Amino acid sequence: MEVNRIYNENCLDTMAKMPEGFVDLTVTSPPYDDLRTYNGYCFDFENVARELFRVTKQGGVVVWVVNDKTVNYCETLTSFKTAILFVEKAGFNLHDTMIYQRTCAFPDVVRYYQDFEYMFVFSKRKPKTVNLLRQMKTEGSLKRQKNKTGVGGERQKDGSLKRIDGTNAFLRKEKARQDETRVKSNVWELPRGNQNSTKDKIAFQHPAIFPEQLANDHIISWSNENDLIYDPFMGSGTTAKMAMLNNRKYIGSEISEEYCKIIETRIKECGGLFFNSFQTELSNEAGT
């Protein structure tokens, strides 16, 4: 099966052409609730989950970003149903339940602002690739660590301490205190809308843009260079673009021909500027 390619078809048709254990990482934000009817198309999410399990490599990861709609004053629970489906029906492990906190929330008159979405990180057994991102510590945290003193001992060349008791046990905590960064939490705050999600104006022709930074950070976290990244609901093409920019291969499925035209423009502009070695093609034939 050809990679670095967008397939204009149902993702089940695309995955049917993939051998077992083919994909390293899937990053996607599927249509949900009433959006399940997507530009006139409907999706069988249970079979999608099962096929994703089949085509994912051992240790591979699926990042599934989803939210709930409120219907008749009650949230639909789509997010939780999805997590149960992937674990109990498809066979994935739920490796982490992460939160995407949006800095631009929509107001509501009867409840607090809904400013987050779930990011379920499913894995096929233990993840084979984990590159945890780091961020700067807060000013308060840095001040607290500066005021802390280590256990008595002799300072070593690498900055750590050696216990006085002669056990040769190095105090890693002391060395870690000198570090001004820490591993990020599983709550990621990202701006969205306007020029925050992307600077590609054509992408805004899609009703729900996947933020580039969000796709970028998951791709870095759960894959390595030259790995294969898949998005079964490619939308405006963000996952493919960020895979290219991070020197990963990609495959995308997008059932809407209208949205495929958006993807084609974004990928060609990105590929021509950064990675001329990547050849992007749109396919309207299921067998190509």
Identify what each model region corresponds to:
Residues 276, 280-288:
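Acidic, low-complexity intrinsically disordered tails
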